[in-house]
Amino acid sequence: MDGILNINKPFGITSFDVVAKVRRIYSQKRVGHGGTLDPYATGVIPVFLGRSTRLIEYLSSVSKTYLAEIELGVETDSYDSEGEITFRKTCDYVTREMIYKTLMDFQGEIIQIPPMYSAVKHRGMRLYNLARQGIEVERIPRVATIYGIELLNYTSPVLRVRIECGHGTYIRSLAFDLGRKLGCGAYLKSLVREAYGQFNLANSLDFADLEAAKCDGKLAGILLPLETAIGHLPRVSLDEKNITRLVNGLEITLDRIDKPEAVAVYNAENSFVAIIQPETDGTWHPAKVFIRQSPKPDAN
C-alpha cells in the first residue's frame, strides 16, 4: 500500500516504535516516519508507507508547531523531565513581563547548542551514547529559525508557550537557554507537536483507530494521498507529452521565471505525477516519478 498516516504519538514510546507498530498492523516493510519525537513528547508524527517514503525528504522545509510546558528554577542534564537534576534556584522574582520580553529574543534566526542527549553525531558517535557514559563534549552551534513564539500562561514556576519553528530546532535547548537568560534555570517539562506542515492534531489518528480499521478491512481507506506531504511545494499541470517525457526519465522545459528547488507535477486529470527539479541549463529533470511507465507500442 502507498500512502501516509498522520499519527498522534502517545507518551512513552519512540518514533521507531511508532513505525514498528504501523509495520505490524499493515504487514508492510517499507515504512518510515517524517520527524523524530522524543519518547516523553506526544503529538503529530507523519508515517509514510510504500512509495510515499520517497517524499519524506521534502518535509524538511515545512514548519512545526509545538505546545511546550517549561518549568523554571530547575536544570537537568538532558534539558527535559527525563534527566537528572543538575541545578536549582528560586524563580520567585520572575514575572510574566520578564518572560514575555525574554521570549521575544528567541524570534527569528537563533543559535542553539544541541543537548548532549540528542542524536547528533560527534566523531561518528551519537551524543546520547556519550552522555550515557558520563562524557560531555563540545557541540557545534547550529542555526535554528523561530517563526513565532507565544506565551499562553504563567503560573510560577511553570509557563506554557506555543512555538512555530523550522527544521532542526531543539525545543529542549530553547527551554534551557530561556532559563539561563532569566537567571534561574529551566527545563522542558512536556511537549506536544500540534502541527507539522499539512499534518495537525485535529485530523490525526491513534493506534486504536488503526486497529479498528484493520478489523473492518479499511486500512487502505484511512491512508492520506501522497500529495498531502508536498502541499507546500509550487505545482504545475503538464500536458501528456511532457508527462510522458518525465515518466521516461527525460528532462523538460518550463516557462517559469522563478526557480524553486522542487515543483510538484500534476497531469490533466489533476493526479500527482512527479517531483521535478531545475538544472543549470534551464531544463527540469524528474527527481521522483510516481506513475509507472506505459508499455511502449510494438514496433511491428
Swiss-Prot record:
It is an enzyme of class 5 (isomerase). GO terms for molecular function: RNA binding; tRNA pseudouridine(55) synthase activity. Gene3D superfamilies: Pseudouridine synthase (3.30.2350.10). The keyword Amino-acid biosynthesis does not apply. Keywords: Isomerase, tRNA processing. It catalyses: uridine(55) in tRNA = pseudouridine(55) in tRNA. InterPro entries: PsdUridine_synth_cat_dom_sf, PsdUridine_synth_N, tRNA_psdUridine_synth_TruB, TruB_C. One of its GO terms (biological process) is tRNA pseudouridine synthesis. Coiled coil: none annotated. Responsible for synthesis of pseudouridine from uracil-55 in the psi GC loop of transfer RNAs. HAMAP family: TruB_bact (MF_01080). This is tRNA pseudouridine synthase B. The lineage of its organism: Bacteria, Bacillati, Chloroflexota, Dehalococcoidia, Dehalococcoidales. The gene is truB.
